[in-house]
Amino acid sequence: MAYDFPVVESVRSVLPVVDEFIIVAGDSSDGTDELLKVFDGEPKVRIIRTVWDTQTYDRGGMIYAQQTDVGLRACTGDWCLYIQSDEIMHHDALPVIREACAKYLDDRRVEGFLLKYVHLYGDYRHYIDSLHFAYPREIRIVRNRPDIHSWRDAQSFRVIPDFNGVDYDVEEGTRKLRCILLDALIFHYGWSRDPRCMVRKANHHNALYSKDYKPVEGVDYYDYGNLGMMPLYEGTFPEAAAERMAAYDWADFVRYDGPRPNIGKRYGVKYRVVDFIEKHILRDGRRIGGFKNYKLLKP
């Protein structure tokens, strides 16, 4: 795995709560196919092989949404739980998810569920506490309906009637899903990977968002900035991530002094004021502005 995604841990973290798990595996030469052999003989896991069409889906990371839809359309259950390969579900979330899916199965108002996020940063101890740099909640469970699609770069989902199968960033004629927020944590490891892999991952990822992107060259590892300026996560971590976290081996490539992390939405004056209001005045998880691609329902 050239980009150090916790694929195996991600899948294993949700297997106990699903009837079937579909892995959409694109064409690659980085050892992913070999890695996925760990699931040979696992009756719940089905792998769909695909070829990424980056000519058609050539902007804004829409190839991620298209690939997500491949998996979504292959699902057969009432509810579809979605997890990206850099996300790991907390074990305490599983009974919460199971109960909610049963409770709201026949309540057609509810089209999806939001999960709460912990975005780890730099190593496995620090996290991003800015609600505007990293989404604090997102849709990760949706009803299995043909008009519900992955949206934009697959961060979220949307109702898109008569979808043309190409324009995953369309807004006109679409609408947000009606969702309930669950007290269930999902951990994002996208910003807490080996800095040597992070350079390669950033180049590949950014190229999928812009055809004009010029890759960074001559850099051996990614600089996360001064991790001492980021808060420590004090809660428990997903059991499925225990082995990976115990193998942490890039302490020599991160620092705890010097210039701060390059997170404009955490350190800019505007966002520091907004963060203060949200955390110390509102104190209920609400955000001022920001990306909210859902209609929140009361349980």
PLM regions and their residue ranges:
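Short, well-formed alpha-helical segments that are part of the catalytic scaffolds
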Residues: 1-20
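Active-site-proximal specificity loops/subdomain of glycosyltransferases
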Residues: 4-9, 29-79
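Short alpha-helix within the catalytic core of nucleotide-sugar-dependent glycosyltransferases
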Residues: 7-12, 33, 77, 91-102
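A structural signal for isolated positions on well-ordered beta-strands in alpha/beta enzyme cores
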Residues: 20-22, 46
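Short beta-strand/turn micro-motifs composed of small residues
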Residues: 25
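Catalytic-site signature of metal-activated, phosphate-bearing donor transferases
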Residues: 61-65, 69, 91-299
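The conserved acidic donor/metal-binding loop of glycosyltransferases
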Residues: 84-88
